[in-house]
């Protein structure tokens, strides 16, 4: 059994986070509420450097509780689709993101464009990387789609499970080198825990790959082994990507997870070495 070394226990970068602490909610705009976490914390642990990442992609956020005041003081509401580049120096800590968005609630903005530009500026500065923001107004709420992840779901495999500790070695000897395939698989059984609070994070994951055929039972056991694992969403997806590359020798690979929302936000990390994210559509559990 592989021991799960904790690279975060002494990380000074996590000590000042508001996550897991009692917090006062501010209703007037304050960009300083945003807090970033260096991506290097996790990437160092899985032997990745910013100069030689094996993937591209984005952290795709949906903010369902965006509200502000217009120039006349009338409340406005919207949904925001936000994409944060995988290459940014920091990921954005989700509780701080929620507190930051709440600070818009009693703040006047001249128009929608001012809200969008403020979000891009503040999030880019916190993440130290590229951010795009699309604001969806109420008149477009009715055309928002609920979809299923593409591919074949592996959750109905009749396996017996007794070990819930993270173990990438479930992927060892999991491929048939004589069968080279291109397929898309998915699972709704992904669960990990918040790195700071240990609250459960519920997700669905899509794995699209080309290469030796992966044993689906072993893949499902591997995904289930995240059940007691403490890491942020983005870190889990990058870990899955690296493990699949290492153990399964995928020639091409995409890992895309969509997590259920918390505090009005959902986080949907996307990592690939051959394709790019399309439109963001929520799943039924989101």
Curated annotation (Swiss-Prot):
Q: Pfam families under this entry?
A: QueF, QueF_N
Catalysed reactions, semicolon-separated: 7-aminomethyl-7-carbaguanine + 2 NADP(+) = 7-cyano-7-deazaguanine + 2 NADPH + 3 H(+)
SUPFAM superfamilies from the xrefs? Answer: Tetrahydrobiopterin biosynthesis enzymes-like
Self-association and partners: Homodimer.
Task: Give the residues the record marks as binding substrate.
Answer: 92-94, 233-234
Q: What is this protein called?
A: NADPH-dependent 7-cyano-7-deazaguanine reductase
Name the Enzyme Commission number(s) assigned to this protein.
Answer: 1.7.1.13
Q: Which domain of life is it from?
A: Bacteria
**GO-annotated molecular function:** preQ1 synthase activity
- Give the signal peptide range: none
Which species is this record about? Shewanella oneidensis (strain ATCC 700550 / JCM 31522 / CIP 106686 / LMG 19005 / NCIMB 14063 / MR-1)
| Record GO cellular component, one term | cytosol
